A protein has these predicted regions:
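Hydrophobic transmembrane alpha-helices and immediately adjacent juxtamembrane helices
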Residues: 1-274
Length: 274
């Protein structure tokens, strides 16, 4: 079962496996959401309150103290918080998916990718709920949204898939080298400041112009989708160059193909004997 299928068919195989087990995935998503929100008094409202409070705090620290004058800055930060949180949670959650669920693998032949996908989809649900936190900002600042806002979910899907794909590459090795989980979590914390959460794409281009540093910055896989989210919601135009989209597209497909291949090839071997 684990070695006869061609490694090159891994992306298609994993997609098919998860479609076949979609009922289980729904139950896992419900389990994760209930575990997080059933106890607290405010329940699912925390999915809105948390990014809202974070955006207000970050806006105060970076906006008032540093001196940002953009009246839409809190909304800009809110979008960055939602996008980055989805990517970071998908990355760190997938990285430890094998170690977190190792006890289940001893008793079932369920494809291991099911747990990674259910975690990613749970993060999607939370991110879509978090978007409602933007409504007060849009009303307060009188921002009129147009039909381009329907593209926002595709940006979120891209962020979650990239984070999950990179996590799939690391997850099998994190079973035998647990320090990798801590390293990834550290990188995620540092990456927050290196990503357009509290700063914007125009700030990046204004700082580095069109030089090599600016081009290399597009290797950060969240820059393009978060910037596009802001453009779609706020009606702005950040002027991302064609090579920026090309670099993100390359990173997206490369990480997805490599992630599914590595996970399909290594996950079972690494888990055996735990």
């Amino acid at each position: 079962m684990w070695v006869n299928r061609s490694i090159w068919a891994s992306p298609i195989t994993i997609v098919k496996e998860n479609i076949e087990h979609r009922g289980l995935i729904r139950r896992l998503i419900r389990r994760d959401l209930d575990a997080r929100f059933r106890g607290p008094l405010l329940g699912y409202l925390w999915a809105i309150i948390e990014p809202l409070l974070l955006a207000l705090v970050y806006s105060f620290v970076f906006g008032i103290i540093v001196g940002r004058s953009d009246p839409h800055y809190p909304a800009i930060v809110m979008i960055g918080v939602i996008g980055w949180s989805l990517f970071a949670k998908s990355l760190t959650g997938t990285t430890k998916t094998l170690t977190s669920n190792s006890g289940l693998f001893q008793f079932t032949k369920i494809p291991k990718s099911v747990f990674a996908v259910s975690g990613m989809l749970t993060n999607y649900v939370l991110s879509f709920i978090s978007l409602f936190a933007l409504v007060p900002f849009l009303i307060y600042y009188g921002i009129e949204v147009d039909t381009s806002i329907i593209m926002v979910p595709f940006c979120l899907i891209a962020l979650g898939l990239v984070g999950t794909s990179v996590g799939l590459i690391i997850a099998p090795f994190a079973v035998r080298v647990p320090d990798l989980v801590n390293i990834v979590q550290f990188i995620a914390r540092v990456g927050f400041f290196l990503s357009p959460v509290m700063w914007t794409y125009p700030m990046l281009s204004g700082k580095f112009g069109s030089g090599n540093a600016f081009v290399l910055a597009h290797l950060n896989p969240v820059i393009v989708p978060i910037t596009m989210m802001r453009d779609f919601i706020l009606g702005s135009n950040s002027g991302i160059p064609d090579y920026g989209f090309a670099m993100f597209g390359g990173l997206f497909f490369f990480s997805f193909i490599l992630g599914t291949m590595v996970f399909r090839r290594k996950a079972h071997k690494m888990v055996v004997g735990l």
